[in-house]
Amino acid sequence: MELTLWTYEGPPHVGAMRVASSMKEIHYVLHAPQGDTYADLLFTMIERRGKRPPVTYTTFQARDLGGDTAELVKRNISEAVERFKPKTLLIGESCTAELIQDQPGALAKGMGFNIPIVNLELPAYSKKENWGASETFYQIIRTLLNDKTNEINNINPQRWKSLGRRPKVNILGPTLLGFRCRDDVIEIQRILSEQGIDTNVVAPLGSSPDDIKRLIDADINICLYQEIAETSCEWLKRKCGMEFTTTIPIGIKNTINFINEVHDKLGLPLTNKEELEHKSKLPWYSKSIDSNYLTGKRVFIFGDGTHAIAAAKIAKDELGFEVVGLGTYSREMARQVRAAAKDLNIEALITNSYLEVEDAMKKASPELVLGTQMERHSAKRLGIPCSVISTPMHVQDVPARYSPQMGWEGANVIFDDWVHPLMMGLEEHLIDMFKHDFEFVDGHQSHLGHTATKGLDNIEDEHGLKNDTLKKNGGVLWTESGRAELTKVPFFVRGKVKSNTEKYALSKGLPEISDETLYDAKAYFS
């Protein structure tokens, strides 16, 4: 166990809560102390739902530990079933309750309820949130479908032809607190409908236990988020022979590949192949003269496995960026991320420490960071533009508007979210350059009525270029001419230029850095 200011994932019972809260007619009884009820806030504050999660906490206190906490568990289970009347009951423990070993799942199964009971054994001290969500979804499917899968062991993905109906698919993986899951589902359903494909069930998001029992009515499964749905898809393939897709439709090329994969598995002819690329504005921009400004931009990527891998492909193949860093906090996706990094000739960063990520980001000197809410904070400290592509996220990354990441519209959203920070970076650099010009009106009143501060002072303070901070670094002094020249360098690469110049001066034994030294260093590293 470690103490940290930030964490990428919560304990596995939070993942179970995500699945339970995403579904209908299901209830989760969580054996937990008072302090573990904080998870409710994730759904009401960040997801901004209009109702609380379907979770009952036993909320034992310190004084209860001297008595029979098992009776407390049984009482809460009984009250939850009587009050909420769920069609399926989930039973689990938080990390603290796991130490007491009351075995609430066994207690619930011995109480004689006439509903399916799913006992969630989630090892809190070795697994994390996404694994907990995946395991919960898998256990629900296995409990509700186990009898039916014994009857059906080989589902033909092309059986829709003989049945005289349109092909049907399940969309598996979207949950609450996932990154833009709600909008992704709408976009993928729209794409499938355009291709003549119906959606049978979307799960866990918006599904009920009765919907889970209908999963085997579909011809194939769409594994939309590997972290959540891959285990369930593999089990359905093993038990009933249901095929599932592996292409994640994020970006133009992956969306086209996804459509091709779905058509191939269903045996459905693809008639409008030539029209597909024109569904988004991203390909048009990539071919335009304006895109030359983006070519070769250095980008650092970190997030969950699904979004990090997809972002790397878009950055390299569709926008012409140079990927200088790729990593994930998801241990379950480490193998896939390492393979993607190897294709880019870089080493993957697999860690759940935001400090390690910030350090790697600093060393890579990117011009754009694509990451989580934590990378947004780190990038701000380093003066680098950033766009959030993955959970964990802030409330501002759960927009009320339609804003998917997948499909054609998702490609448009990604284009806006990634390109605009770079364009604004150029604008800020131009302001930086001219702010100390005598013709630039620097002392004007703002609309708030406060007097603006001097531009050069702002630049120097923001980027650490004042005498007291830049005066000495490893024995190297910055002269006035050197400082003045450094402020003309775009802020998003200024840190790298400063660091390289100081290394150059030290290697040459120079006692101070002037503008000429900076020019020499630039030529040396070019």
From Swiss-Prot:
Swiss-Prot/TrEMBL keywords: 4Fe-4S, ATP-binding, Chlorophyll biosynthesis, Iron, Iron-sulfur, Metal-binding, Nucleotide-binding, Oxidoreductase, Photosynthesis
Disulfide bridge partners, by residue number: none
Entry's EC annotation: 1.3.7.7
Cofactor: [4Fe-4S] cluster
Cofactor note: Binds 1 [4Fe-4S] cluster per heterodimer. The cluster is bound at the heterodimer interface by residues from both subunits.
Residues noted as binding [4Fe-4S] cluster in the record, renumbered to the chain: 36
Active site: 290 (proton donor)
Keyword Hydrolase part of the UniProt annotation: no
GO biological process: light-independent chlorophyll biosynthetic process; photosynthesis, dark reaction
InterPro entries, A to Z: ChlB/BchB/BchZ (IPR050152), LI-POR_suB-like_C (IPR013580), Nase/OxRdtase_comp1 (IPR000510), P-CP_red_C (IPR042298), Protochl_reductB (IPR005969), Protochlorophyllide_Rdtase (IPR016209)
GO molecular function, one term: metal ion binding
Keyword Ubl conjugation found: no
UniProt: substrate binding residues: 425-426
Catalytic activity: chlorophyllide a + oxidized 2[4Fe-4S]-[ferredoxin] + 2 ADP + 2 phosphate = protochlorophyllide a + reduced 2[4Fe-4S]-[ferredoxin] + 2 ATP + 2 H2O
Pathway recorded for this protein: Porphyrin-containing compound metabolism; chlorophyll biosynthesis (light-independent)
Binding partners and assembly: Protochlorophyllide reductase is composed of three subunits; ChlL, ChlN and ChlB. Forms a heterotetramer of two ChlB and two ChlN subunits.
Purpose: Component of the dark-operative protochlorophyllide reductase (DPOR) that uses Mg-ATP and reduced ferredoxin to reduce ring D of protochlorophyllide (Pchlide) to form chlorophyllide a (Chlide). This reaction is light-independent. The NB-protein (ChlN-ChlB) is the catalytic component of the complex.
UniProt record similarity statement: Belongs to the ChlB/BchB/BchZ family.
Name used for this protein in its record: Light-independent protochlorophyllide reductase subunit B
